[in-house]
């Protein structure tokens, strides 16, 4: 029979792709991890891993077991937080990197400080946010989605018992760094071919392959991208202290009360960008995630 220790070892093996690396983070030996995984496979009658020359890869059955295991360990964690005073309420959220979202999360926490909510917030790209919600690691995920990618996203979500609700529609914007000579002069958009850019890491659901420049060619063919990052802190610092530009959904401007970005709307944009919330539909959303979703929805609709 599979026990909790084996499940914890299994999660570590899947996420590290190595028995030895899993042993390192679990403070045990590689032999112990390997034996535990072998025993788990025999107990379940399944091959959970393909043993490769350089590591391990979960099989299709292994990936399915991984999702169930994440859910089990989440429930175990919830049980461990039950005390005599009642059950601790947890909010688990993942999101694309966003300064305005961070500001609103702080506001939500402060407004509900006396309720003693416990929170977990994770920032990453669209694919990782989807996987975390799928694997029961987070209650809800907030992402930006190109309009023409909606059908592909719906397919991905549907096969994993998930769906999304649109919250806001925005345009693609050019953000100029404060050291650029045209900063503060928003009368016309400077030539994109003359700029150097800092851009977020992209994925298949949020990319710039339909955004056109002033001559009708694709922006991706014009842009000189000098810096690529997944950190909103790096993005903010570079825009404040360099002449780099950034093309993103109109999201940074939500934080203009705190950081004064010079923004210009791009021309020739036929595709809009949606800000959406994704969640699992095979279980009822708990009250706290629903409360946070309503809070964010009210903010973006202001």
PLM regions: where:
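Central regulatory/effector-binding core of bacterial HTH transcription factors
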Residues: 88-153
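Flexible hinge/capping segments at coil-to-helix
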Residues: 156-201
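N-terminal short secondary-structure element
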Residues: 1-30, 36, 65
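A late-sequence structural motif
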Residues: 262-302
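A short LG(V/I)-centered, amphipathic sequence patch enriched
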Residues: 41-58
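Secondary-structure junction motif
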Residues: 102-105, 182-219, 286
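Alpha-helical linker/hinge and terminal dimerization helices associated
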Residues: 43-44, 65-87
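Hydrophobic hinge/microswitch elements
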Residues: 134-137, 204-263
């Amino acid at each position: 029979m599979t026990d909790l220790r084996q499940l914890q070892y299994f999660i570590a093996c899947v996420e590290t792709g190595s028995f030895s690396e899993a042993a390192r983070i679990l403070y045990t030996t590689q032999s112990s991890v390997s034996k535990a995984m072998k025993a788990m496979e025999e107990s379940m009658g399944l091959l959970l891993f393909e043993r490769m020359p350089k590591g391990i890869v979960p099989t299709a059955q292994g990936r399915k077991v991984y999702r169930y295991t994440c859910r089990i360990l989440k429930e175990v964690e919830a049980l461990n937080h039950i005390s005599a005073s009642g059950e601790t309420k947890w909010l688990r959220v993942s999101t694309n990197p966003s300064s305005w979202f961070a500001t609103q999360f702080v506001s939500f926490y402060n407004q509900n400080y006396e309720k003693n909510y416990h929170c977990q917030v994770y920032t990453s790209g669209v694919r990782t946010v989807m996987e975390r919600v799928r694997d029961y690691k987070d209650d809800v995920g907030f992402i930006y989605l190109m309009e023409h990618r909606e059908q592909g996203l719906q397919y991905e979500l549907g096969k994993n018992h998930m769906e999304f609700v649109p919250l806001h529609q925005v345009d693609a914007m050019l953000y100029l760094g404060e050291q650029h000579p045209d900063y503060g002069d928003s009368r016309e958009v400077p030539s994109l071919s003359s700029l150097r850019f800092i851009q977020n890491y992209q994925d298949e659901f949020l990319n710039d392959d339909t955004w056109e420049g002033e001559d009708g060619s694709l922006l991706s063919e014009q842009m000189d991208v000098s810096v690529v990052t997944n950190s909103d802190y790096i993005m903010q610092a570079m825009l404040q202290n360099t002449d780099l530009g950034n093309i993103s959904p109109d999201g940074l401007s939500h934080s203009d009360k705190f950081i004064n970005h010079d923004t210009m709307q791009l021309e020739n944009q036929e595709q809009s960008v949606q800000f959406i919330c994704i969640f699992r539909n095979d279980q009822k959303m708990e009250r706290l995630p629903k409360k946070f979703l309503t809070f964010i929805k009210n903010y973006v609709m202001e």
